Amino acid sequence: MMKRIPAILVLEDGAYYKGWSFQQDKQEITIGEVVFNTGMTGYQEIITDPSYFHQIVAFTYPEIGNTGINNQDIESHSISIKGLIAKNICKISSSWREQQSLVKYLSSNNIPFIFGIDTRSLTQYLRQFGTMNGCISTDNLNHSYLKQKICEIPSMQGLDLIPHVTTRNVYPWDEKSFPNWYLTDNIRVHRVIQLKVIVIDFGVKLNILRRLATLGCQITVVPAHTPLKDILAYQPDGILLSNGPGDPSAVHYGIQTVTNLLDYNVPIFGICMGHQILNLALKAKTFKLKFGHRGINHPSGLNQQVEITSQNHGFAVELTSVFESPVRVTHFNLNDTTIAGTGHNQSPYFSVQYHPESSPGPHDADYLFESFIEIMTKSKNKVS
């Protein structure tokens, strides 16, 4: 039986919360940006999502871990978060798909976690004062000392975290969505023309790749630093700019690559970080949100059409800057009216701030992958 030990969460402004953790082989202090996610389900997908790199995630739902961990519901091949915060972590999980408990999964990967704190109070605090750096510690419980340690770490603004999560090597991808991912077999699969898609990996979620493969695309994933000439050498029918962590304005090499790609009129689809990088390349600007959008029930839409979407980002495209660029707004976040999607007025470029691949979350926006297929097909037919 794992031994319960005292733990503490400290925020950079000095606020702190006392709770509990379990004894791990390696006791240490972990520091990262403290954010909250409002999803009731999908904790496994969340903690393995590379977009959460360098972040300590607080789950607002009062208990997580009930269904354990399995080898399918992962969005990368390692845990991405720096730490986990919960009101309660279920120690006796149950699911026919379970292969290990959440506690064992976190402990075996030396991911610090704290439970037994008032996560509602913490969430309200972050909403009022904004997301900020913080730490979880079981090694040293002196909050004054820990506050000093936190202040040594830079804030998320200005951080380029892509080198930590992008692939080091080019690789093909052909794994499709799991058979039970859809409740219907009525899925259009485009097999007449096999479209070549280059995915620029800023921290791509695996289900983005699965959705493209399911629709019959020939996928090649390339590192974020890949030179333009190497990308064009594949003669792609389309470019997908993936999700990823950090401040998009700090990813200068990615912005420059996309800026140069615009000269070739190759269809581009941006998701989350990719959305921000595409808009920065189109001369728009981004800014840091006070506490971000992280959850699986965010309404997005325009002109009386609404999609319930999965979102995970701390930055957004500045609305006034879009008016000075060649794009139009296609979606707004209906909670705070920030931009949730844009499209180019003349060229085949479009992007969304949310996750159409869900995992976790609803499938309302999955049609965007179909839209990408249609845009690539039309563009390919024009060339031929």
Curated annotation (Swiss-Prot):
GO cellular component, as recorded: chloroplast
Entry EC no(s): 6.3.5.5
Family annotation (PROSITE patterns): GATASE_TYPE_1 (PS51273)
GO BP terms: 'de novo' pyrimidine nucleobase biosynthetic process; 'de novo' UMP biosynthetic process; glutamine metabolic process; L-arginine biosynthetic process
Domain Glutamine amidotransferase type-1: 196-382
Region of interest: CPSase: 1-192
Gene3D superfamilies documented for this protein: 3.40.50.880, Carbamoyl-phosphate synthase small subunit, N-terminal domain (3.50.30.20)
SUPFAM superfamilies xref list: Carbamoyl phosphate synthetase, small subunit N-terminal domain (SSF52021), Class I glutamine amidotransferase-like (SSF52317)
Chain residues that bind L-glutamine: S51, G244, G246, M273, Q276, N312, G314, F315
Major enzyme class: ligase
Transmembrane segments: none
Annotated metabolic or biological route of this protein: Amino-acid biosynthesis; L-arginine biosynthesis; carbamoyl phosphate from bicarbonate: step 1/1; Pyrimidine metabolism; UMP biosynthesis via de novo pathway; (S)-dihydroorotate from bicarbonate: step 1/3
PANTHER family: CARBAMOYL-PHOSPHATE SYNTHASE SMALL CHAIN, MULTIFUNCTIONAL TRYPTOPHAN BIOSYNTHESIS PROTEIN-RELATED
Subunit structure and binding partners: Composed of two chains; the small (or glutamine) chain promotes the hydrolysis of glutamine to ammonia, which is used by the large (or ammonia) chain to synthesize carbamoyl phosphate. Tetramer of heterodimers (alpha,beta)4.
Function summary: Small subunit of the glutamine-dependent carbamoyl phosphate synthetase (CPSase). CPSase catalyzes the formation of carbamoyl phosphate from the ammonia moiety of glutamine, carbonate, and phosphate donated by ATP, constituting the first step of 2 biosynthetic pathways, one leading to arginine and/or urea and the other to pyrimidine nucleotides. The small subunit (glutamine amidotransferase) binds and cleaves glutamine to supply the large subunit with the substrate ammonia.
Family from the record: Belongs to the CarA family.
This protein's name: Carbamoyl phosphate synthase small chain
Organism for this UniProt entry: Pyropia yezoensis (Susabi-nori)
